[in-house]
Amino acid sequence: MDLYIYYRVQAADAALFLTKVSALQDNLSRLYAVRTALKRSPVAQDGMHTWMEVYLAVNEDFAVKLEQAVAASGLSSLIDGKRHTEQFLDLSLCV
């Protein structure tokens, strides 16, 4: 299963947020051997960018570990609103 998590962050906080979320993903990659990606919308709207964290081929328990790591990281203080999580299966592996 792959996780795609998106949310909005003030454009003015982009540099600080990038530092924090990159450290989070590096740590999760090291601890749980997951592949990660980080994306951001190219243009800010209303002073905000949409960001997306991607976690590929994770097991069902990873989501709990991820939320614990996010809570400990302080990311939530820089996010406007909620983190939205979508789960997807790679169908090329399921066929």
What are these regions (language model features)?
Residues 34, 73-89:
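Conserved short beta-strand edge segments in small beta-sheet-based binding/regulatory domains
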Residues 1-67, 87-95:
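Short S/T/G/P-rich N-terminal loop/turn motif that feeds into the first structured element of a domain
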